[in-house]
Structures are given as structure tokens and as C-alpha cells.
Amino acid sequence: CSGNNALAVGSLCGYTDIKADGTTFLIRSLGERAGCIGSLAALDGSTPSRINIKNSTLDLLLKAPCGSAVGCRKTACDTVISDSDITVHVEGDAVAGIGSAEGKGSLLIKNSDIKSSSSSGIYSLDIGFMNKGCIINNSTINSHLINDPDYHEPSRLMQQN
């Protein structure tokens, strides 16, 4: 999916409750504010969103100035990933592979294999939240993070030239 506000699975604005069991996702999301699975914005007083992924295979790519491959931006989100195989790559100024660079929440990863990579600005992270980390049990995490303070999303560079 692509656009100014691009989200493949979830809610553009507000609460989301996503449950995936035994599911295979292949998602490519590009935009100004983008996500693969989750929510892009909160409503005032909204309930924390929930994402529960189990027994699933995910192959996710996110390219946006801000967003999250799995998670919510600008809103609280509680995420549980179990017995799953996830490959995720993100690029942007304030992006997260799994979790949120701009929101709050909790993240539990158990019995899973996660391969995460990113080329991003200083306000980005591979796995977790800016305000706290996550809990990982009996899982393999392979993370490759290139954090560059001068990173600019490629489309912005093309517009400037």
C-alpha cells in the first residue's frame, strides 16, 4: 500500500484489536505516515490498541518518514508475538520495526524468530518503545540497525534536488 496515510492492516485513526493466528503476511507499505500492521493515529481518550500475532509468518517492509511495521504511532499499543517467524525492514526518520518510535505500550515476544533491519534517523528503533523496552522469552532476535543522524527518507532527497 502507498499514500500519505498508508496502512495495510488495522486502523488509520483510533483503536484497533488485531488477532492473527496461523496467518502469512507479505506487506510493503510506503507513505508519509505508514504502517504494515497497527494504527496510525489515536482518538482523544481512545483505549490502548492490541495486536496479537501467533503461529504466523510475516515479511514486512516499511518506508516512511514516520510509522511502524508492527505497532501504533501516536497511540498506546499492547503487542504480543508468539510462535512466529518475522522478517522486517524499516526506513525513515522516526520509525520502528516492532513497537513504536512515537507511542507507548508493551511488547512481549515469545518462542519466535525475529529478523529486523533498519536504515533510519536518530528517533528510530528496531524493537521496543522510546519510553521502555520489551520482554523477550525463548526467542531468537537478529537485529541490524543503521542509525544515522543525517538520514533523510529517499523521496525527500529527490524532492529537494
Where are these regions (language model features)?
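Surface-exposed loop/turn motifs in large extracellular/passenger domains
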Residues: C1-L30, I37-K63, G67-A94, I98-S119, ...
